[in-house]
């Protein structure tokens, strides 16, 4: 079996997280991969950083997001780090360095 290049593999895992979240929530979610995987300078030990845009955030959605990311990452032997947000939060906090960085280097999944 041919090995996937690191970024391709990370995107495939991010898409799996997105699909499982969308299915569980019953509506589409937006996922943006950022960090070393998105920049293409990830190492073998690098995690996969995902900004997950949800319709709303509460304790249940945070737990569900954490569970899905953990399961997908565990099965693949990768750590998947997630940051939940909403579209309104992204607009409101757009001037913060974190969101500027995600906008600059992020890859929509």
Question: What are the residue ranges of the model-derived segments?
Answer:
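Short beta-strand->loop micro-motif that forms the acidic, two-metal-ion catalytic signature
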Residues: 48-52
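Catalytic core of pol beta-like nucleotidyltransferases
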Residues: 1-30, 38-44, 55-109
């Amino acid at each position: 079996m041919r090995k996937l290049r690191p970024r391709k593999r990370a995107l495939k895992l991010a898409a799996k997280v997105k699909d499982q979240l969308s299915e569980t929530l019953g509506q589409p979610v937006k996922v943006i991969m950022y960090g070393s995987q998105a920049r293409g300078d990830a190492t073998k030990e690098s995690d996969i950083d995902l900004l997950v845009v949800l319709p709303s955030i509460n304790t249940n959605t945070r737990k569900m997001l954490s569970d899905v990311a953990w399961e997908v990452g565990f099965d693949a032997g990768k750590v998947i780090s997630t940051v939940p947000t909403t579209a309104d939060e992204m607009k409101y906090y757009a001037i913060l360095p974190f969101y500027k960085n995600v906008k600059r280097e992020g890859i929509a999944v």
